[in-house]
Amino acid sequence: MRKGNSLHRNLDTIFGNEVYSNNLTHQEFLSVRNQHLWEKLRDIPLYEAVHTWLSSLTNHTSRSYRGSILALERIGLISLKMPLQQFALLNHNIILDAIKQIPTTVVCWSEGTKQVRAACYISLTKFLNRVTSGIISIAQPSHQESNKTFYKIRDLVKTNAMNQVERVLFLEELSKINYRDWLIAQTILQGAKRVTEALSVTTDHICFENGVISFNQIKSRGVFKTTIITYPQKFMKLLQDYVGERKGLVFITKKGRGVGLKQLAGTFAKAGIKAHIPFKVTPHVLRATAVTEYKKMGCSDSDIMKITGHSSSKMIYAYDKSTIADNASKKVSLI
């Protein structure tokens, strides 16, 4: 997918002086404008528009949607080489339905994967609808009961969580493989942090005296949210020794750069194998483990939300790994 940033430039320059200099009625103006825009769409390939769209998203969403778009091209639902004019002529609702109804003989996608691909396609058409002043239509999800595009697949998150013994063994093996990544794992665990939050934390957000680290989250619509996590003094001493007199990012490579997610995921997976964890240990497994443990300890959802940054108790419940039988009736007798 070729990088380019000329989509907005092309769309911003489609109006010549002719449109403004002539004494046109509003209807005539709209007709001229749409014709200019339509002709310009012939010269803009879809891959260029996709790159501009992806650059407007968060890093995590951009990575996910880039993979989705490439997957849609691989199975022939779209072609990134087609001009936007041709893309505008497609029936996007049919493509959306095709994503949900793709047979396993073509590609084996889970329902969750299909819904991510569908959400990606809708997002792309919404973006293009806006920048083309409505010429490219928006793919509309189906709300028919028997053929809904989106519906809840599960109540609980699919991510596994380690128990106490597994957690200890994992950290022990990780400390032997990479000391820095061992510190990162503990940072994630204590604060139930997303891996991006842990990797982006800077030294000015640490108060060693009070044993706290502040984490910034970017929520929807660019809203910032701060969580303050208290860490054991033993850990803070190890972290202080690791940081030394450095300023900037807390966790860095030997070359002074930020730690890559791919590298960290590889180290975690390796430690999980050595610790004989029965599932792949990813950074998100540590977050799920933390929330699960806080729930087991009896912490209220509101307290856990202050740690994780979740905006509702429903999101906390999704991490509850306890059995259905482990409920209030086991602790209290009313008869």
Curated annotation (Swiss-Prot):
Keywords of the record, alphabetical order, are: DNA integration, DNA recombination, DNA-binding, Plasmid, Viral genome integration, Virus entry into host cell
**Of which family is this protein a member?**
Belongs to the 'phage' integrase family.
Any matching Pfam family? Phage_integrase
One GO biological process this protein is involved in is: DNA integration
Task: Enumerate the spans annotated as Core-binding (CB) domain.
Answer: 44-129
Instruction: Indicate the residues that form the catalytic site.
Output: 194, 219, 284, 287, 310, 319
Q: Which cysteines are joined by disulfide bonds?
A: none
Classification via InterPro entries = CB (IPR044068), DNA_brk_join_enz (IPR011010), Integrase-like_cat_sf (IPR013762), Integrase_catalytic (IPR002104)
Q: Where is the Tyr recombinase domain?
A: 155-332
Q: What is this protein called?
A: Virulence plasmid integrase pGP8-D
Q: Which GO terms describe its molecular function?
A: DNA binding
Protein's organism: Chlamydia psittaci (Chlamydophila psittaci)
